[in-house]
A protein has these predicted regions:
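Bacterial N-terminal signal peptides
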Residues: 24-38
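Structural recognition of the beta-strand scaffold that forms the well-ordered cores
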Residues: 53-55, 85-87, 130-135, 153, ...
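Glycine-rich, highly charged phosphate/nucleotide-binding loops
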Residues: 94, 100-125
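Catalytic beta-strand/loop cores that center a nucleophilic Ser/Cys/Thr
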Residues: 84, 117, 128, 181, ...
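Solvent-exposed loop/turn segments at secondary-structure junctions
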Residues: 58-61, 91-94, 137-141, 159, ...
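A glycine-rich, often tryptophan-bearing local segment used as a flexible ligand/cofactor-contacting loop or short
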Residues: 125, 134, 138-206
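Extracellular ligand-binding/catalytic regions of CAZymes and related secreted enzymes
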Residues: 45-50, 56, 64-67, 71-80, ...
Length: 318
């Protein structure tokens, strides 16, 4: 019969107690090591959708594609589940604005725009938003406080602009600084092949190295490539094909905020894969419209901080 000494029993108890607290400690340490080395699942994120305001009011030229833009952005929000949308919009052709001559009464339309923006873009209202989208806005919009809006973006909010967002607040340097450029002119609508400058960015990673699209291509002023991260560009004039640098889309940081802009979006068939004109024709295939939708969805999600992307300025076309 084996002999068991009291000291051995004590040692066994001690070892058992040590193991009882050492094992959890080891697990915690290993877990911490995995976190620091990235060998773990993605951290849990707030699953609540972001809140986005789509602004489509205009005091200048009004694009016929605005209703299509509003619809597509709403569909992208619903399909992605990443964000919800509210709208700041006024349709000038609404019967309530009809004047004695049967045309929209400019004073009534302006008053309605002012009222809508006062409600949707007040300092108090902005506090409840994560991003604002300017969908083909034009002219000097009667915001309650334009500078407060820009300051709001700087605090870490998002901004996305499509097409004529650069033809908004013309001659207002703070806004132009925020968005990154200002509309100068455009030629006839034309087919162009855009160079994809960043295939890793969520706004461009689904696009080929050279992407062909038919649209109205803006030429810009007050644009500095050293202050933006280029996404899409042309290396020749869209119409006369002379060599040059013609930016189409970019992202940039603005304070702590994030800004995405694309000059594409003039035509309905750029936005909507199902759209057809009165003759049942379209210049852009459904596939191009679907690619454009992913382009703006990626840009919006980047602006919301939901997708990663390098926003460091580039000094030359890649």
């Amino acid at each position: 019969m084996p002999t068991c000494f009291v000291g051995e029993k004590t040692d066994l108890r001690l070892m058992k107690n040590q193991l009882s607290w050492t094992l959890p400690t080891i697990l915690v340490l290993v877990g911490g090591l995995l976190l620091t080395t990235g060998v773990t699942s993605a951290p849990a994120q707030n699953t609540s959708p972001k809140r986005v305001l789509v602004v489509s009011t205009t005091t200048g030229f009004r694009h016929s594609s605005i209703p299509t833009a509003e619809k597509i952005i709403g569909e992208l929000a619903k399909q992605s589940g990443a964000f919800t949308v509210d709208y700041a919009r006024v349709e000038p052709n609404d019967p309530q604005f009809k004047g004695a001559d049967g045309k929209p009464d400019a004073a009534k339309v302006k008053a309605a725009i002012t009222e809508v923006l006062a409600k949707k873009m007040s300092v108090a209202a902005l506090k409840n938003l994560d991003a604002v989208i300017f969908a083909n806005t034009t002219g000097n919009l009667p915001l309650p406080d334009p500078q407060a809006f820009l300051d709001w973006i700087k605090t870490g909010k998002g901004f996305a602009g499509m097409h004529s967002a650069t033809d908004t607040f013309p001659g207002f340097p703070p806004y132009i600084e925020m968005i990154g450029g200002e509309f100068k002119t455009h030629g006839a609508q034309v087919e162009v092949t855009a160079i994809n400058q960043d295939a890793q960015c969520p706004a461009c990673r689904h696009l080929p190295a050279n992407w062909t699209v038919f649209d109205e291509i803006y030429q810009l002023k007050n644009f500095d490539r050293n202050k933006v991260h280029g996404l899409l560009t042309l290396d020749k004039h869209p119409n006369d094909k002379s060599p040059g640098d013609y930016p189409i889309a970019w992202i940039k940081e603005y304070g702590q905020g994030r800004v995405f802009y694309t000059s594409l979006g003039h035509r309905e068939d750029v936005w909507d894969a199902q759209w057809k004109d009165g003759k049942g024709e379209r210049k852009n295939s459904p596939a191009i419209a679907e690619a454009y939708q992913q382009h703006i969805l990626g840009g919006i999600k980047w602006a919301l901080g939901l997708e990663k992307g390098d926003a460091r300025p580039q000094t030359a076309v890649q």
